[in-house]
From Swiss-Prot:
<keyword id="KW-0528">Neurotoxin</keyword>
<feature type="modified residue" description="Glycine amide">
    <location>
        <position position="29"/>
    </location>
</feature>
<keyword id="KW-0872">Ion channel impairing toxin</keyword>
<dbReference type="GO" id="GO:0044231">
    <property type="term" value="C:host cell presynaptic membrane"/>
</dbReference>
<comment type="similarity">
    <text>Belongs to the conotoxin O1 superfamily.</text>
</comment>
<feature type="modified residue" description="4-hydroxyproline">
    <location>
        <position position="14"/>
    </location>
</feature>
<feature type="disulfide bond">
    <location>
        <begin position="17"/>
        <end position="27"/>
    </location>
</feature>
<keyword id="KW-0964">Secreted</keyword>
<keyword id="KW-0800">Toxin</keyword>
<dbReference type="InterPro" id="IPR012322">
    <property type="entry name" value="Conotoxin_d-typ_CS"/>
</dbReference>
<keyword id="KW-0027">Amidation</keyword>
<keyword id="KW-0738">Voltage-gated sodium channel impairing toxin</keyword>
<keyword id="KW-0638">Presynaptic neurotoxin</keyword>
<keyword id="KW-0960">Knottin</keyword>
<feature type="disulfide bond">
    <location>
        <begin position="10"/>
        <end position="22"/>
    </location>
</feature>
<dbReference type="GO" id="GO:0005576">
    <property type="term" value="C:extracellular region"/>
</dbReference>
<protein>
    <recommendedName>
        <fullName>Delta-conotoxin-like EVIB</fullName>
    </recommendedName>
</protein>
């Protein structure tokens, strides 16, 4: 499954971020 790049909304699923960080609801690099 593809991950989401920084700046992408991730809600409560930080594991879907390419950077694995979600703060607070957006993937961060």
């Amino acid at each position: 499954e593809a991950c989401y790049p920084p700046g992408t909304f991730c809600g409560i699923k930080p594991g879907l971020c390419c950077s694995e960080l979600c703060l607070p609801a957006v993937c961060v690099g």
